[in-house]
């Protein structure tokens, strides 16, 4: 049996956490031969800690052979001790009448503290995925608060946007989603992100040629993917939790186990490619192997695409400037 991998999950008793933990414990994220120890962080209030205890009881009751141990805590340094993987799911949701800038600042406090805790106690090669919104900027804050860790260890989740876009293309083409490759989602995990199928193929054939409808692209496809989260809240009365958890599993599984040459979208610190300033955490096409990701470089960016990329970058830079005074 392999040595257990330590996985931290924050916001562990929340909706996404509840949809995520059982799948991690069953081996869906790191492999069916990889034992895991779950290190679970929740808020210190009584209600959150009681809910966490209940979730841990349920995890025990599943008798997962791969679940080698659990820790439940309200202390980030306990949750992050010696971890290999961190899923930062917990974030302050936007309350009624709350301005976006207030939300940014509230979350900046959380992710500054969590970045510092990771810096202090996590393994030096820890893989960090930020799910809690605003995910790109929260990941940037955590990265900047962990100066002793490699910035490449910090990523933001754009896989939900990527999967949503795959599904919309599959519906449009009437073709199975599994045959679609080389889709890209550029930018921020927000309604400004840009799903781009110019390079995508379905069973090897160009999707751009098959659809060949710029009106559908600009008027239906891009806004449908961008507003999908809001549409789910409207329909369900709650935000998308199971699909977000599924995307987190996909993101980490591909990062750790490899994407087998397939392009996937990850929010990663820019190296200056595609005119994105260095260090900005931005959705890019990547391939992954041996626990490392590599940017897909030198894709041509046409005027239509540049407009969308500029817009999502402007939003990210605005978010970054809103929290820069907290980062020294």
Curated annotation (Swiss-Prot):
Residues annotated as catalytic: 189 (proton acceptor)
Record's keyword annotation contains Oxidoreductase: yes
Binding site for NAD(+): 11-17, 107, 114, 131-133
Keyword set, alphabetical order: NAD, Oxidoreductase, Tricarboxylic acid cycle
Binding of substrate, residues: 94, 100, 133, 164
Recorded catalytic activity of this chain's protein: (S)-malate + NAD(+) = oxaloacetate + NADH + H(+)
Domain of life: Bacteria
Any single biological process term in GO: malate metabolic process
GO molecular function: L-malate dehydrogenase (NAD+) activity
EC identifiers of the protein: 1.1.1.37
Alphabetized SUPFAM superfamilies for the sequence: LDH C-terminal domain-like (SSF56327), NAD(P)-binding Rossmann-fold domains (SSF51735)
PANTHER family: MALATE DEHYDROGENASE
Function as written in the Swiss-Prot or TrEMBL entry: Catalyzes the reversible oxidation of malate to oxaloacetate.
Family membership noted in the UniProt record: Belongs to the LDH/MDH superfamily. MDH type 2 family.
Record NCBIfam families: MalateDH-SF1 (TIGR01759), PRK05442.1 (NF003916)
Protein's UniProt name: Malate dehydrogenase
Organism: Xanthomonas campestris pv. campestris (strain ATCC 33913 / DSM 3586 / NCPPB 528 / LMG 568 / P 25)
């Amino acid at each position: 049996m392999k040595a257990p991998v330590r996985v931290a999950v924050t916001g562990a008793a929340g909706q996404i956490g509840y949809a995520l933990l059982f799948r991690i414990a069953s081996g869906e994220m790191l492999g069916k031969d990889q034992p895991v120890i779950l290190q679970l962080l929740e808020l210190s209030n009584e209600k959150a800690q009681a809910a966490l205890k209940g979730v841990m009881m349920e995890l025990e009751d599943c008798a997962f052979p791969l679940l080698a141990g659990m820790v439940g805590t309200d202390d980030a340094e306990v949750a992050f001790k010696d971890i290999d993987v961190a899923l930062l799911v917990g974030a302050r949701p936007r309350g009624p009448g709350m301005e976006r800038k207030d939300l940014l600042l509230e979350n900046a406090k959380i992710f500054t503290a969590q970045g510092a805790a990771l810096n202090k106690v996590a393994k030096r090669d820890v893989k960090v995925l930020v799910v809690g919104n605003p995910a790109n900027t929260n990941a940037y804050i955590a990265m900047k608060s962990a100066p002793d860790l490699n910035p490449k260890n910090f990523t933001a989740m754009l896989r939900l946007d990527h999967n949503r876009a795959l599904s919309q293309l599959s519906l449009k083409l009437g073709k199975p989603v599994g045959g679609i490759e080389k889709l890209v989602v550029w930018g921020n995990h927000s309604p400004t992100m840009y799903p781009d199928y110019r390079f995508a193929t379905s069973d090897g054939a160009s999707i751009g040629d098959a659809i060949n409808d710029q009106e559908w692209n600009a008027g239906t496809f891009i806004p449908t993917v961008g507003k999908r989260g809001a549409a789910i809240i409207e329909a369900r009365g709650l935000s998308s939790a199971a699909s977000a958890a599924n995307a987190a599993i996909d993101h980490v599984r591909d990062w750790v186990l490899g994407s087998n040459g397939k392009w996937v979208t990850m929010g990663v610190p820019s190296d200056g490619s595609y005119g994105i300033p260095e260090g900005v955490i931005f959705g890019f096409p990547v391939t992954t192997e041996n626990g490392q990701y590599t940017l897909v470089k030198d894709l041509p960016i046409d005027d239509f695409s540049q407009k969308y990329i500029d817009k999502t970058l402007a939003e990210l830079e605005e978010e970054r400037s809103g929290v820069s005074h907290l980062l020294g």
